[in-house]
Amino acid sequence: MPISSTLNQRVRARLENDGFEHFSDESVSNEALDEGESNEDTEQDNSDQRETDDDDTEDDGHTEISDINPSLNTISFGALAKAQAALGKRKRRTTSTTDITPKRTKVLSRQSPTPSTSSNKEHDQCQGLSEFQKHLASNAKKPPQKLTHRTSKHAPTIQSSRHAVSRKRTILEPLAVPKPRDPRFDSVVLSHSTNGDPSTAANADIHARNNYAFLNHYRTDEIAELRKQVSALQTKKKKTERDDHEIVRLKREITSMSDRQRAFERKEMEREVLVQHRRREKELIREGKKSQPYFLKKGEVKREVIAKRFTEMSGKEKQRALERRRKKVAGKERKEMPWGRRGVE
């Protein structure tokens, strides 16, 4: 307040002739200085606080100061010191009860934000921390992953248990496609027709092939008949466009049927090679020459089939087969040649 600022001023009192007690200047001045210095800091803080809060009352205070100043000049220094001490005690009591709470609220409002903002800041800090940790983890050197290889080519494939499952799901099952099932060649029907014999039921396909082996004879007869038709059309004197189309169709039919017959014969030869090999292995095990049987691979079976076919061929057939083989190899080599050298030879 302005009054307190005026009271804090150090004024030397004039000597008066009244009946007041005479004080020594040194004792009074020392006491006043001690009390003034002790209360100076608190009074200045309170005055600054009130000056910032009560800006509107300053104008009125100035008018009061102008009225009070002439009356203060007549007051003795001892009375001023006593008044200052009394005012200081009263102000301490009032500030302890009234001024502390607004100060605390202001300080807390400045230092600590509102709960909503503080929670948002904490959430942002946690989120930033987690992102920083993820960044560090991604930049960190990953340990070299061990390649999982199979112990052998016959072993099952190895897959990690952490392998991600496919996100694709079959919501609607596709419609079942009708598959032809001929009861004459069905394994279930053939197993019942073998009267429950497990050895014959396991080889149902073999028995079906043996039961319907006459179809292959029909196929050979049909191929011979088609070849006769082609030769008759080719020797025809007046051929039409329809005859030409018929010759092309018959030749295509003969090629497909002959390929089917050769595939059937090749499978039969492979089956015979496997049967003979198993028979030999069983005999060797029975004689004690071997402890475990040896199973042929597909490439070995194929080589034995080719060797068997060459032994069964006649001289002309062998020459024809060797010529086809030579042309096939020469064509592959020609494709690998540069384009400029292909016509030289």
Swiss-Prot record:
Basic and acidic residues composition bias: residue spans: 16-25, 312-322, 330-345
Coiled-coil intervals: 219-267
Any one annotated GO CC term: 90S preribosome
InterPro entries, per database record: RRP36 (IPR009292)
Ligase recorded as keyword: no
Keywords associated with the record: Coiled coil, Nucleus, Ribonucleoprotein, Ribosome biogenesis, rRNA processing
Highest taxon of the lineage: Eukaryota
Pfam families referenced in this protein's UniProt entry, alphabetically: RRP36
Principal location listed in the UniProt entry: nucleus
GO BP: maturation of SSU-rRNA from tricistronic rRNA transcript (SSU-rRNA, 5.8S rRNA, LSU-rRNA)
Places the protein is found: Nucleus, Nucleolus
Biased composition (Polar residues): 108-119
Entry keyword Metal-binding: no
Compositionally biased tracts (Basic residues): 143-153
Similarity section: Belongs to the RRP36 family.
Subunit structure: Associates with 90S and pre-40S pre-ribosomal particles.
Function according to Swiss-Prot or TrEMBL: Component of the 90S pre-ribosome involved in the maturation of rRNAs. Required for early cleavages of the pre-RNAs in the 40S ribosomal subunit maturation pathway.
Name of the protein in question: rRNA biogenesis protein RRP36
